Amino acid sequence: MTLKSSEGEGGNSMRTALSDLYLEHLLQKRNRPETSLNQSNVTTEDMYTNGSPAPGSPAHAKGQEARRVRLIQFEKITEEPMGITLKLNEKQSCTVARILHGGMIHRQGSLHVGDEILEINGTNVTNHSVDQLQKAMKETKGMISLKVIANQQSRLPALQMFMRAQFDYDPQKDNLIPCKEAGLKFVTGDIIQIINKDDSNWWQGRVEGSSKESAGLIPSPELQEWRVASVAHSAPSEAPSCSPFGKKKKCKDKYLAKHSSIFDQLDVVSYEEVVRLPAFKRKTLVLIGASGVGRSHIKNGLLSHNPEKFAYPAPYTTRPPKKSEEDGKEYHFISTEEMTKNISANEFLEFGSYQGNMFGTKFETVHQIHKQDKIAILDIEPQTLKTVRTAELSPFIVFIAPTDQGTQTEALQQLQKDSEAIRSQYAHYFDLSLVNNSVDETLKKLQEAFDQACSSPQWVPVSWVY
């Protein structure tokens, strides 16, 4: 049930443990009874055109084709939308294009995608536009009668798939959506249950935990990635920036070069498939934030208040040790040649240089903390998030934002600007965001949130399990 991992035995063992946990969770859910759809106030009656016989009759058995027409009647007594969209097929017949999960029609189970509608309340739909028919369906109240030819190929099982949104979406601001009222609004980090993805451009989903039971339309990953790439293509070119927090320069040539898969993964985000696991312990606490936001104070506070729970992996450096420094305590001192060799062997999760000396944190140092049954604290650059967000490290990622109180000095404004640049580019990785108005207050909220995460069911990337 597990896939190969390039992180070594530690990564494989952690992935296996999470896979076993997920399998146990699925087995516990297997015997739960399913709820049936509400079909009250709906009547159906089979009819046959041109005197064609019913299926099973001798004439039908000889291969004569029968166009089976169903008369569907139901009462619409509220302003609730019917949750249905129509289209004209290649024969210019009116067919059901989409049924929103949880909507009125879906709950009744009276229509299915692909069904052909012949009449609405006795009126033949021929020579009517889709907009006219949609309006008629929307404005009709009381008893509604439909004559329908069923599409027998549309009876597909319900989809069970969950995705974490990696962008904010408001259907009212989307000019591409076929029906704004049918759209689903969500924000980065929302868990969306995917109900239907038959349409390559518009999936149906609902936000997990929302009071709204009916599904809404959301852009498919392909459509969203095309949209972002199109915006990048049309954006004016910018001068390259060396700042890690500067606005990322979109390279249209790279994207046009046959949609490089690596470029897509790095620059275009839409959704991430996730699974829900029972409570398990996160092994790493990652602090993300702009320089000067107070991550070091928070890290030191956690280490001093809970030395038995948290530990910080001592970085490796090529600079000479000071007289008061002990090798392996605050730093591991190493030669430039050896560090370069270790970097080539992918032993560092993060490395860089400062004032001519190299610094870096090794995976091995983090693993040693885990073996002591402690939680490793990492205060890394946001570019490293892709590297650490694995089942092997099982991180809980916290974004520290600058204070929103006090005098707006020039330094604070710059800090807020840098923080917003990080948030806008990496927010889809964050498990928690905290405003650091007070170190003590931030420490309290962080520890409470971390403990809550480790003791509650959690949504994790599907790659952590399979």
UniProtKB/Swiss-Prot annotation:
Residues of the PDZ domain: 71-152
Residues modified as Phosphoserine: 13, 19, 52, 57, 110, 243
Disrupted-gene phenotype: Neutrophils form multiple transient pseudopods upon chemotactic stimulation, and do not migrate efficiently in vitro.
N-acetylthreonine modification, residue list: 2
Expression sites (tissue/organ): Abundantly expressed in the erythrocytes (at protein level).
Keywords: Acetylation, Cell membrane, Cell projection, Lipoprotein, Membrane, Palmitate, Phosphoprotein, SH3 domain
InterPro entries on file: GK/Ca_channel_bsu (IPR008145), Guanylate_kin-like_dom (IPR008144), Guanylate_kinase_CS (IPR020590), MAGUK (IPR050716), MPP1_SH3 (IPR035475), P-loop_NTPase (IPR027417), PDZ (IPR001478), PDZ_sf (IPR036034)
Annotated segments matching region Interaction with PALS1: 268-466
Keyword flag Cell division: no
Cellular compartments per GO CC: centriolar satellite; cortical cytoskeleton; membrane; plasma membrane; stereocilium
Positions of the UniProt region annotated as Disordered: 29-65
Tagged with keyword Membrane: yes
UniProt cross-references to SUPFAM superfamilies, sorted A to Z: P-loop containing nucleoside triphosphate hydrolases, PDZ domain-like, SH3-domain
Residues covered by the Guanylate kinase-like domain: 282-451
Pfam families: Guanylate_kin, PDZ, SH3_1
PTM info: Palmitoylated.
Subcellular location, record wording: Cell membrane; Cell projection, Stereocilium
Domain of life: Eukaryota
Membrane topology: Lipid-anchor
Biased composition (Polar residues): 34-52
Family recorded in the similarity comment: Belongs to the MAGUK family.
Protein's job: Essential regulator of neutrophil polarity. Regulates neutrophil polarization by regulating AKT1 phosphorylation through a mechanism that is independent of PIK3CG activity.
Subunit structure: Heterodimer with PALS1. Interacts with DLG5 and NF2. Interacts (via guanylate kinase-like domain) with WHRN (via third PDZ domain).
The protein's name: 55 kDa erythrocyte membrane protein
Organism listed in the record: Mus musculus
Gene designation: Mpp1
